[in-house]
Amino acid sequence: MPTPSMEDYIEQIYLLIDEKGYARVSDIAEALSVHPSSVTKMVQKLDKDEYLIYEKYRGLVLTTKGKKIGERLVYRHDLLEQFMRIIGVDEGKIYNDVEGIEHHLSWEAIDRIGDLVEYFEQDAVRVETLRGVQRANEEKSN
């Protein structure tokens, strides 16, 4: 299993390849706000662990294993953002909140959150009911 840091790199590499068709060390460094030398070290580790194939000065490609995990990590991130919107978290806080929790949840918890998102999306009245509960709770605390 990849570490949380490895997951961040795999997720970002997956997104860059999906968006641009390739991922360079400089692109990864910029996206993650880290030094290129840190990216090179992590890419070498990901290569060793068979998440990607890296050739110095030639670039990198995700292996089947890396693509599968990258896809799952992007799904997890997107699902958690969706969940945060449903429960009414301020849009400006969602990204950082998701970044703060995504590595600490089991895949079982992610699957259950997926069930909950689906439950709310099946009927808009459910979301409105939740909003009513939230408004009532806000009034109590004021």
Swiss-Prot record:
Claim: Transcription is one of the keywords in the record: yes
Main location per the UniProt record: cytoplasm
GO molecular function, one term: manganese ion binding
Positions of Mn(2+) 2 binding: E11, H77, E99, E102
Domain spans labelled HTH dtxR-type: 1-63
Subcellular location: Cytoplasm
Keywords linked to the UniProt accession: Activator, Cytoplasm, DNA-binding, Manganese, Metal-binding, Repressor, Transcription, Transcription regulation
Any one GO CC term of the record: cytoplasm
Keyword Transcription regulation found: yes
Description of activity control: DNA binding is strongly activated by Mn(2+).
Database matches in InterPro entries: DtxR_MntR_Metal-Reg (IPR050536), Fe_dep_repressor (IPR001367), Fe_dep_repressor_sf (IPR036421), HTH_DTXR (IPR022687), HTH_tscrpt_reg_MntR (IPR022897), Iron_dep_repressor (IPR022689), WH-like_DNA-bd_sf (IPR036388), WH_DNA-bd_sf (IPR036390)
Entries under NCBIfam families matching the protein: PRK03902.1
UniProt xrefs under PANTHER family: IRON (METAL) DEPENDENT REPRESSOR, DTXR FAMILY, TRANSCRIPTIONAL REGULATOR MNTR
Family: Belongs to the DtxR/MntR family.
Subunit structure: Homodimer.
Full protein name: HTH-type transcriptional regulator MntR
Natural source organism: Bacillus cereus (strain G9842)
Lineage: Bacteria, Bacillati, Bacillota, Bacilli, Bacillales
Gene of this entry: mntR
